[in-house]
Amino acid sequence: MELEVLRFSSQKDSTNGVLFDVTGGIRKFLCYTLEDEYREDKVMGETRIPSGTYNITLRTTGGFHGRYVKKYGQMHKGMLWVRDVPGFEYILIHTGNTDEHTAGCLLLGDSQQANFGSSDGMVGSSVNAYKRVYPPIAKALEEGESVSITYTNFDYVG
C-alpha cells in the first residue's frame, strides 16, 4: 500500500495537506491532514517531518497505544508509526484538531480550516476520518503488506 501527503499550505504554526492512497498509480482521496509548521532548524514537538518516503509499521507500546485500545477496542491493532525519519522518532498518524495536538505527527480530518491570517489551521471530524482511514492500513500491515507514505511539499517554505 502506498500513501501520499500533499502539503499545500505552511504557515506560522501549522501545515495543511491532503492524504491519498496512491496504490497502483491511482490517486484516491482519503482525508485532510494537519501537521506542525516547516522549520529550518527542528524544534522538538513543533516541527513537521522532512519531505520524503517512509515506511509505516504498527507500534503496540506507549501511551497513545494504550489510550487507543480503550477508545477504539478491537478496531485498534497498534498506532500507525512513520519510521526512520531523520532526526525524528515516534511520528504517529492519529486524531486531533489543531497544531497543539501534533508534536510533529500527522493528524487526520474530514474537514479543514485555512491556516493563514488569524487561524492556526484545524482539521475537523478527526475521529470519523481516523475510523475510516485506519482499518485498511492496519489490515494491510497485519497481512504482511509493506505500507509506505510519501510527504510531498507543494507549499512555499522559503
Could you say what each language-model-derived stretch is?
Residues 1-158:
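Cell wall/extracellular polymer interaction/catalysis modules
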